[in-house]
Amino acid sequence: MKKILMLIELSERNAIGRPVRITIRELADALNTSPQTVLRLLAELEDEGLIERKTEGRRTYIEILPKGLDFLQDICDKISNALSKGVIVGEVVSGLGEGAYYVRQYEPLIEEYLGFKPFPGTLNVKILFPKTVLDAVCNIRPVIIPGFVKDGRTFGDVKAYPVMIGGIKGAIVVPSRTIHPPRIAEIIAPVNLREALKLKDGDRVRLEVIQ
């Protein structure tokens, strides 16, 4: 893990395609470790052909070699693959109580586009993994619930992402205009999810996005 962090730190210092002057103390401070550990890590990375290190007097120049770049790319690919599997882990939180109103307004369209009559309310989940709602669904094509005008008020489009939570099919809904921060997912379902799954604030939940 420390070698991976070292390569990431070097890449952030632009040691790609050219040698960059870096002090051992800078690396030690950045990685919150000792200069001795930094020297050992650099020696190991050099022995593995991941970096090239040159010393001129008291100056140290380091470059990530193609093998090191391939190693970093492989890690990025694995992380991207993990994030694209559509698994979301979050924590149940209380909402502002406005979900019921909006679900009622969109109810006929939700039935038409998602195939179920929604319970008038949403389950709010604070995303713990991945970082935001959009990160969780970035590779998923949403169901677009079209906006409409009612009693002179405009209701915008809503993006819906079908999910399974505790064996119940529902959907994450992302309104075109929302007051929720990007780490809060609003989930609708045919039932009251809090009651059906016996959930309370702080409970950990797992959602699987249906692709």
Swiss-Prot record:
Q: Which reaction does it catalyse?
A: riboflavin + CTP = CDP + FMN + H(+)
Q: Where does the UniProt annotation place the signal sequence?
A: none
User: To which pathway does this protein belong?
Assistant: Cofactor biosynthesis; FMN biosynthesis; FMN from riboflavin (CTP route): step 1/1
TM segment ranges = none
Please indicate if the UniProt record lists Endoplasmic reticulum as a keyword.
no
Q: Which UniProt keywords apply?
A: Flavoprotein, FMN, Kinase, Magnesium, Metal-binding, Nucleotide-binding, Transferase
User: Which residues make up the binding site for CDP?
Assistant: G95, L96, G97, E98, G99, A100, V191, N192, L193, R194
Q: Which gene encodes it?
A: ribK
Pfam families per UniProt: CTP-dep_RFKase, HTH_Crp_2
Q: What is this protein called?
A: Riboflavin kinase
What does this protein need as cofactor?
Mg(2+)
Q: Which InterPro entries match?
A: HTH_CRP, RibK_CTP-dep, Riboflavin_kinase_archaeal, Riboflavin_kinase_CTP-dep, Riboflavin_kinase_dom_sf, WH-like_DNA-bd_sf, WH_DNA-bd_sf
- UniProt binding sites for Mg(2+): T122, N124
Q: Where is this region: H-T-H motif-like?
A: 1-85
**SUPFAM superfamilies named in the record:** Riboflavin kinase-like, Winged helix' DNA-binding domain
Q: Where does FMN bind?
A: T178, E186
Which family is annotated? Belongs to the archaeal riboflavin kinase family.
